């Protein structure tokens, strides 16, 4: 699907419970600025901000649903208003079968926005009828009835990702076991199998960021082999996370106090990961300076 000059605009709409929120999250991961249920006039103002010189907003996604008063009229107004700026917003319409929507609402124990005193099925039917013209005019319709989230993500990335890479954000975190495991770690590796620089008098005062400590740690038997092997393993894990739609990962490296070995290994591992496609890597030394 083609992009538009100046600012690219996608209006995300569809049946309640069909996955609008998930679609918005995917677009956000792709670098889109996402706004939820803006009044129509604010959508136009947001676009004007995006068109202004120096603006960082080049891709705007707005989630719209039937809770907005005069929804179909609002949508038409937005499209006509943006047309005066030579912008043709694309419409992404999310839908699912009635039985799937009923099941989702029952599982979440929520009421449908159009249900009122009606049955859930009647509320869904009313919304479907109301949105029929919108669906007919949509640029892309995605049926999530049998679509798992990774496949939904792939469909949206294919349609709206353009040349944008959906980055996986990896945090490599060193820590000391004596202070406890990091609560946010997705995977933990123990590097206490390496000799401890703490017992080398001239290295003890320095951290794993010091060149002498780093050289000492990486020069130990098994250190580089560990780094190479773990790097290859993480490549497999990261690819799997991407397929499952997980964009954030914390890799924890632990030693006794979080000062020498884990710091040096975390730094070296991050350097290897930084060469990977579609990765943003940062290093966090949780317990450095804590001793």
From Swiss-Prot:
MF terms in GO: ATP binding; GTP binding
Binding residues for ATP: 14-21
Keywords: ATP-binding, GTP-binding, Nucleotide-binding
Binding site for GTP: 65-68
Disulfide bonds, paired cysteine numbers: none
Pfam families, alphabetized: PapZ_C, RapZ-like_N
NCBIfam families, A to Z: PRK05416.1 (NF003828)
HAMAP family (alphabetical): RapZ_like
Similarity remark: Belongs to the RapZ-like family.
Purpose of the protein: Displays ATPase and GTPase activities.
Record-given protein name: Nucleotide-binding protein MSMEG_3079/MSMEI_3001
Organism: Mycolicibacterium smegmatis (strain ATCC 700084 / mc(2)155)
């Amino acid at each position: 699907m083609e992009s538009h000059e100046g600012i690219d605009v996608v209006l995300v709409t569809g049946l309640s419970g069909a996955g609008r929120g998930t679609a918005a999250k995917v677009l956000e991961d792709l670098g889109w600025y996402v706004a939820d249920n803006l009044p129509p006039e604010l959508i136009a103002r947001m676009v004007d901000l995006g068109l202004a010189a120096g603006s960082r907003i080049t891709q705007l996604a707005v989630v719209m649903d039937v809770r907005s008063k005069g929804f179909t009229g609002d949508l038409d107004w937005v499209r006509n208003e943006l047309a005066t700026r030579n912008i043709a917003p694309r419409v992404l319409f999310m839908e699912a079968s009635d039985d799937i929507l009923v099941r989702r609402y029952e599982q979440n124990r929520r009421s449908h926005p159009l249900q009122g005193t009606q049955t859930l099925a009647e509320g869904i039917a009313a919304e479907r009828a109301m949105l029929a013209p919108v669906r007919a005019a949509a640029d892309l319709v995605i049926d999530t009835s049998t679509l798992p989230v990774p496949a939904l993500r792939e469909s949206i990335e294919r349609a709206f990702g353009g040349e944008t890479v959906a980055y996986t954000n990896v945090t490599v975190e060193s820590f000391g076991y004596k202070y406890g495991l990091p609560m946010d770690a997705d995977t933990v590796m123990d590097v206490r199998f390496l000799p401890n620089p703490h017992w080398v008098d001239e290295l003890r005062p320095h951290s794993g960021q010091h060149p002498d400590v780093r050289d000492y740690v990486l020069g130990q038997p098994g250190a580089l082999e560990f780094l190479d092997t773990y790097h290859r393993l993480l490549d497999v894990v990261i690819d799997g996370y991407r397929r499952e739609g997980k964009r954030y990962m914390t890799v924890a490296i632990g030693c006794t106090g979080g000062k020498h070995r884990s710091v040096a290994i975390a730094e070296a591992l991050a350097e290897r990961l930084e060469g990977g496609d579609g990765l943003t890597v940062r290093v966090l030394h949780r317990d450095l300076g804590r001793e």
